[in-house]
Regions:
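C-terminal accessory/regulatory regions appended to core domains
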Residues: 1-166
Length: 166
């Protein structure tokens, strides 16, 4: 089975903004065709191939459904894979802002200030949404994979910061 990218599997143009309803419809349409239950009485080989396709489709669907995974897939497709462990392309200014925010979260937790925690959480979520819009523009309008990758790393950083609220 030749390696296919998630966009090819669903017949979608490789771009960041996707129609979620169209993706869902395609997923169920394709899944019906290759679901292993349809091949229960088939040969072992056919059953194994159906299982492989079902797994491939599920993995592709998960990648395309999650904006970070979709962005990482686009970066890889465009020759700019993202190393999650590296913050090298994130600006020092952004990192300093996040350090200050992390301290504010810690202070609010220590003092039991739930109102301040909620304000901080909403600010992170808003910044994340704005960055995802910037990622979409970088990929789909500007075709600037480096900018998209930098913004995507920022989103990943903010996601980790949101874990501080759990």
């Amino acid at each position: 089975m030749a390696a296919m990218n998630p966009f090819e599997i669903f017949g979608l143009k490789p771009q960041f903004r996707i129609d979620k309803q169209k993706l869902d419809e395609k997923y169920f349409e394709i899944q019906k065709k290759v679901h292993p239950d349809r091949f229960a009485s088939a040969s072992d080989t056919e059953n194994r191939v159906a299982q492989q396709w079902a797994t491939l489709i599920n993995d592709a669907f998960q990648k395309l459904s999650d904006p970070i995974q979709r962005g990482k897939a686009l970066c890889a497709l465009r020759g700019h894979p993202i190393d999650e462990d590296s913050s090298g392309s994130i600006s020092e200014e952004f990192l300093l802002e996040q350090l200050e925010r992390r301290e504010a979260i810690s202070d609010a937790k220590d003092s039991g200030n739930t109102a301040e925690l909620e304000v901080l959480k909403k600010a992170i979520e808003k910044e994340k949404d704005e960055l995802l819009d910037e990622v979409a523009d970088a990929f789909d309008v500007k075709s600037d994979v480096s900018l998209a990758a930098e913004d995507l790393k920022k989103v990943m950083f903010l996601n980790r910061q949101l874990l501080d609220f759990e």
